[in-house]
Amino acid sequence: MTLAVPVVDLGGFLHGGRAGRLAAAQAFGRAMEEAGFATITGHGVAPALVRDTYRCVREFFAQPEQQKRRHTPPEQTKGRGYLPMKIESVAATLDGRTPPDLCEALVFASLQRERRGVGLPNYWPEEPTELAARINAYFDAMLALARHLMQLSALALALPEDWFAPMYREPSLTLRFVNYPDQEEPPEPGQLRYGAHHDYGGLTILRQDEAPGGLQICDAEDVWHDVPPHPDGFVINVGDLMSRWTNGRWRSTLHRVVNPPRELTGSTQRLSMVAFTGPNGATEVACLPTCADAEHPPRFAPVNAQAYVQSKLAASHALAPAR
């Protein structure tokens, strides 16, 4: 059974007039309210860039474990670098008690700050040789797309189109390339490729491939539904900060990545390319003026964007309880 994730064409928003922009915004807003997820097409990201980045990252994950671990930070946190298998459990952010997730990742964060020579540097593998160029180009494409999505969101929420612009001049944007290897051994009871969780930030941009054992979302009746990949689409979903901004109108939907069926033969390897986007870390996230009134007062206390996300990241590594 499949819960339909709406497909929203951004062509009218990016290339149309006022009517086309509003129509796309309204469709996007409905999807965020009803499902918390949408698949976008007509987004303007070059297919060749996606293919080249995917190929390059897959080559990185094909290297021996010892070679990949050269780019693991000593503390093995989720901030940046190579994250080996089984070092996190995202279900812990919801007080879940599940075995570690069956995935490995390569993470890049705060590239804008790194380019200016400030903040922590990322871990840049030497192989493949073109990886740094591909990652930087993909980051720029995701940054541009994130800003378009926030303009779209502002219109959908009856705000001026540039409402979020000050918070997204240098936003929080983390690229996470996730490899779900073939499962040679059966998972432990309750163990998934990626446990059930909500995303923490603003909007998440996901490119997923065709492989068994994929993304599922949970509906209001606690039933799980597959989210099929789109050949040229990105899956967009609402994170906690965006939901708090909208007073819960936009849903931060529970989701997970399931294991492939054990009876399958052949490779079930899966690679996902994720851009976690959100406002600048100094932003105070409080209810938007168009999302509350006398009958619908603010449901959430204001939070600092960076502090909120960091508490969730720490919990996923069992470093501290989530707030």
Feature map (PLM): residue ranges:
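Peripheral, non-catalytic segments flanking oxidoreductase cores
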Residues: 1-323
